[in-house]
Amino acid sequence: MQANIALGLVELSSIARGIEALDAMCKAAGVKPEVHQAISKGKYIIVVSGPLGEVESSLAKGREIGGNAVVASHIIRNVHSGALAALNKKVKADKIEAVGIVETKEALPALFAADAAAKAAFVHVAEVNTGKGIGGKGYFTVVGEPGAVRTAVSAGVKAIGEDAVVSRIVIPNAHEHLGAAI
């Protein structure tokens, strides 16, 4: 299910510049900061949500203020509500049949890939980690029926490209205790 809102994602190589960009982004448009944090490698990530036009204006201001400290920026239109709900927190699934994990080289592509995965197949997004405490990398996990999980993982990888991926795993018939680990 899509949430009919957009997400703006900015990754900066400077924590101070990131905080300045966040302030400018929030002042420039009617957006809600979903994530704003320092991550490993001295980077700062910002994720804002709102109507597409507001997010576009906010992201433009963030890129302007961030200048050469901007490492990456993306917009996700009509973000899937499951990807947004699992952003930097674990969302328990009722039943776990299969588990899919995609680990990304950088933080923000994990969110972009998780959104694509959730839109491609009927899966539950269990978590989207955007770099906090994991060396600046990112990952997402999805659970569901094995075929759906395979489809979701493939769609997530396709959305960001193989070069952005560290690893992708599908565990069919996951053990019941795996639920506590994801």
Where are these regions (language model features)?
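Short amphipathic alpha-helical segments enriched in hydrophobics
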Residues: 26-29, 59, 66
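Short, structured secondary-structure boundary patches
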Residues: 53-59, 146-151
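N-terminal structural module
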Residues: 10-31
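An amphipathic, aromatic/His-enriched active-site/gating alpha helix that lines ligand/cofactor pockets
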Residues: 58, 62, 156-159
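Hydrophobic, ordered structural segments
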Residues: 48, 52-55, 63-80
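A compositionally biased, intrinsically disordered/low-complexity signal enriched
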Residues: 19, 46-48, 55, 111, ...
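A structural signal for small-residue-enriched, beta-sheet-centric alpha/beta enzyme cores
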Residues: 2, 7-14, 34-43, 71-106, ...
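Polybasic, low-complexity intrinsically disordered tails and interdomain linkers
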Residues: 24, 36-38, 63
